[in-house]
Structure formats: structure tokens, C-alpha cells
Amino acid sequence: MEGFGVHTFRFVNAEDKSTFVKFHWKPKLGLQSVAWNEAVKINGADPDFHRRDLWNAIQSGNFPEWELAVQLFDQDFADNFDFDVLDPTKIIPEEILPVRPIGRMVLDRMPDNFFAETEQVAFMTQNVPPGIDFSNDPLLQGRNFSYLDTQLKRLGGPNFTHLPINAPKCPMHNFQQDGHMAMRNPVGRANYQPNSHGEGPRESPSRGYRHFPADEQGQKARLRPESFADHYSQARQFFISQTGAEQRHIASALTFELSKVESLAIRERMVSHLLNIDETLATTVAQKLGFQSMPKPADAAMPTRQDLEASPALSIVERGPMRFEGRKLGIMIADGVDAKLLKALTKAVAAQKAVIELIAPKVGGVTADDGSSIEANHMIDGGPSVLFDAVVLLTSHQAIDDLVKEAAARDFVADAFQHCKYIGYDQSAMPLLEKAGISGQLDEGTIQLSDSKDIEAFVEKLGKLRVSGREPSVKLGKASPPIA
């Protein structure tokens, strides 16, 4: 995932000059997501799937890494931009204002104690070092208050900053003393300044935090600015920035969620909002919900702008990894598997800095064609294809008859195909493809592996992660025809 701070902050230099900034985290391995049907099955097969993936990556030395990047702009840009930069629901497209990398974050170890180092973390937006300051973003200002209030209640009192995970590495002195669960033992008679005892901490104006001296004008009122009133234009821009497959997924997600809403009036009201974003999206959702007629578009404070261009930076597919690094290949094996072919495949995947896991009829493993024993990571029932980014079927003529009788083996193949994953297979696995119902639909994402050249071609394609051209044929998020 990417991280996006939504708020506008300030960078303030030593001369008290301010530059607006928006923060981004950009994953080194690119963006990736799963289909809804796939997510449901993942949660059933392994509820800890994502945290296990993170844990295994760190333990194996494949440290997840993000780039810290910023969008920087001045007051003149803010005054002339199409939307209010203080509106946290709006973005500045990266095509207009590119992000600039300024640092990185590498996750290279797990916490020693999850409660002490994770559960007790007191995250607060107002915790910033000198040089970073706040804008008048109303949601940010609200969070600067409410997060402190939250920690007072969540962690039991004002001294949560004494907990090691929340305490500064360099001891800081202030006038805060005692209170519930205090962990410090200050000495002396005075904890205030000035005092006649000559004790206690002293103010350090040159080193303390100073807010940016911004010039302010206008009325102070609890009103949402008119500049925040355009609720649909960037929603439309986001939708048209997606690929066809992603648009189908959005329509399917909206359909699923709205299908759980009991009130027809609310379903109609939501579709009326969609009409202000994209008519095709709205009619697709309405068709899937069984509407007999379309509602009128919702009243809009401002008309939806049609001149905003698509931003490819908003698409997961357009910004996919294009490499298999950090991903996982699941290989189904059986007794009599071609040991030479398996070894070559393992070597090729390792060269891509990816990992393999073996799935077999028994977790104890199989006996290869050269007589060697190969241990498995999963038995077929416990290692469905949803746990892997791509799959390979390396079976044997002697074992395939038993494999095709196993529902879990057939589901392994059918799900991988339905979820548009790349599938490699040897000649002996053809009966399994037939039983899974995909032998007549083989495409550029189903590749027969006979030798090292086939393996090289297969591994080279894995970076795409999904065979997007297959999706309409498997009806995964397929769009319905519009209502007239």
C-alpha cells in the first residue's frame, strides 16, 4: 500500500520561510491488491495472511521498504490550484505536482513485545519536530486536539509519554509533574520558572519549538468553506483514472455493499450520488441492484467538472510492480515430480528475489522421479492458490489420476484461473486443467513448462502479477449493460 497523509502541513526553514507540504509513502515493491472473491477465501484459509507475509519477509531478510516523498508548493500555487489545499478530501495530482523523494523507511525487525511496542503507541498528529508545522486544515486542527484527548483515555492518564515507546530517546525536562501512573521522580522544591530557588528546568528559546508566524485575516466561524463544496469532480477524476478492470471492481464493490442496505430509498440515494460522478458507473450499479428505473442525480452544491484529466498515478494497475520480487509462487507437486524441472524453477524464482512454497497431497512431501524426497510446506487442502501470487503444477503421470479426484486440487487450479493469476504446468497436469474446467480457455497466462527456456519465459511474465485480459471471460467484476 501507499501511505498518504491527506493533510497539508508546512515546512519551515531557519529563516522562518514556509512551504506547504503533503507527505507520501511509496512502496518500493509497487502497489498490489486482491479481488473481493480472493480476499474472502484468503481470510478463510489464513486470517493472519498479511501479517504472516510481513513477518516472513522481515525474517527472511527481504525487508519491506517505502520511500518518503513530498509534494511541495507555495502560497501562490495554493491560491491558483483548482481546489482548496486545506480540504483533506482533495488531492493534488502527481502529474501536476510530482512527488520528490526525501527519505526511506525500512522494516528490518519485528517488535520484541507487541504490547509494549505497538499496542501502547500514542500516535498524535501534533507530535512534530522543529521545521514541520501545521496549516489551517480544519480536520488537522481537530485531530491536533482530539488525538491527545484520545490518548488520555486510551492509556489511562496524562503520563503516557513516560512509557518507553512514547518517550523521547533524549531526556527532556518540562514542568509536568506527578499525576496518574507517573514514572519519574523529580527532585527539588520548584517545578516552575522563574523561581527564587534556582532549581528546575529552564526555557531554551533557541532550541524549543516555535510555530510559524503566519498572517491571518478573515472571519473566524464554524462554517465549512465554500471552497470545500465540490464533492464530485475529484471522485470522477479518480474513477476515470482507473483501468477498465479496476472500474469493474469499483462497480462490483459498490453493488455488494449497497446490496446489504435494507432501505431501497438509501440505495437509490447512493446511486443518485454516483450519477454525479459517472453515468456508466451509476447505471452499472443500478442494473446489478435490480433497479427498474434510474433516480434523479443528487442535488450538487457545485456542478461536476468534466475538464479534469485522468491521473494514471491513481491506478494500482498502472503503477504495479512489474517484477516478482517479494512475491510468492505456489508449486503443486506430487510423487514422480520432475526433480530437474523443479530445481530449475526454484533457481529462477530465487533470482527474482521471490520465494516458493510447495503444496503436496501430504505435508510430509513427495518422492521425485530421481528418488529424492521433497518436503512440502502445505497439504493441498491447507494451501489454496489464493495464498500465492502465481502457481505452477508439476505433477506426474503416475500421480495425476489421484489428484484430479481431489476437490481441493481442482479448486486450486480453478481459483488461480478465476483470479487471473499466471499458471505454469507440465504436460502431466493437463487432466487436472481439464477437470478444473479451464483446458479450453488457456491463454497467455497459462504456460506449459518443459525446459529452462519455458521457465525463463514464465518467470519473466510473473512481474505483471495478473492476466488482465482474462478477467471478462471469468466474469470477475464484469460490468452489466447500462439501463436505457
Segments predicted by a language model, with ranges:
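Internal mixed beta-strand/loop scaffold within catalytic domains of large alpha/beta enzymes
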Residues: 1-40, 47-49
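Short, structured patches in soluble enzyme cores that scaffold and shape functional sites
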Residues: 10-13, 22-27, 70-74, 107-109, ...
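Short helix/loop capping segments that flank catalytic or ligand/cofactor-binding pockets
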Residues: 19-22, 31-34, 78-79, 113-117, ...
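Charged, compositionally biased interaction regions
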Residues: 48-52, 56-322
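Extended, subdomain-level signal for the structured scaffold at the beginning of enzyme domains
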Residues: 218-222, 244, 248-268, 272-418, ...
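ADP-ribose/adenylate-binding Rossmann-like module
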Residues: 419-426
